[in-house]
């Protein structure tokens, strides 16, 4: 059993785990759309996307929780592409690059999703924005 919490301030790290150092799985297990998933940082991001119909969203509980082992499991499950949608801040963009490099090691392609608004993230998207995103990703 493990617990995860997230700070609501600018404190780093954003995500705290108990017991310290525990590695949580990617959550939830989903059916891919066109052999792909959307990877987001936090639980509220994934809840918002699922609630608005983008049901192949998966949360990593923070960038440092993504490992080649977890990506290999996704590959075995048939995932061929990960659409990375991390927070649109400097840390999120660095995290997107780190995840892209890990995905290259296991032959999973990536696309980076970024909104022009610095503060836009998956947890703050409206229904209209999620519909547009889904249409752009999957037609």
Language-model regions, residue ranges each:
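Phosphate-handling DNA/RNA-contact segment within nucleic-acid enzymes
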Residues: 1-77
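Acidic beta-strand-to-loop metal/phosphate-binding motif
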Residues: 39, 80-91, 114
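Hydrophobic anchor at the start of a short beta-strand
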Residues: 56-57, 82, 109-111
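Acidic, metal-coordinating catalytic cores used for nucleic-acid/nucleotide bond scission
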Residues: 63-67, 86-96
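A generic structural motif
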Residues: 109-119
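Short, small/acidic-rich helices and loops at N termini and domain boundaries
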Residues: 120, 124-139
């Amino acid at each position: 059993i493990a617990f995860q919490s997230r700070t609501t301030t600018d404190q780093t790290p954003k995500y705290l785990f108990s017991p310290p150092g525990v590695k949580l799985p990617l959550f939830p297990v989903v059916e891919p759309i066109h052999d792909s998933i959307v990877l987001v940082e936090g639980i509220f991001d994934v809840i918002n996307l699922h609630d608005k119909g983008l049901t192949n969203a998966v949360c990593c509980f923070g960038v440092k929780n993504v490992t080649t082992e977890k990506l290999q499991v996704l590959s075995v499950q048939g995932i061929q592409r990960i659409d990375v949608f991390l927070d649109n801040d400097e840390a999120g963009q660095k995290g997107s690059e780190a995840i892209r490099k890990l995905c290259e090691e296991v032959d999973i392609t990536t696309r980076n999703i970024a909104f022009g608004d610095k503060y836009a993230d998956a947890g703050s998207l409206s229904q209209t924005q999620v519909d547009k995103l889904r249409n752009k990703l999957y037609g």
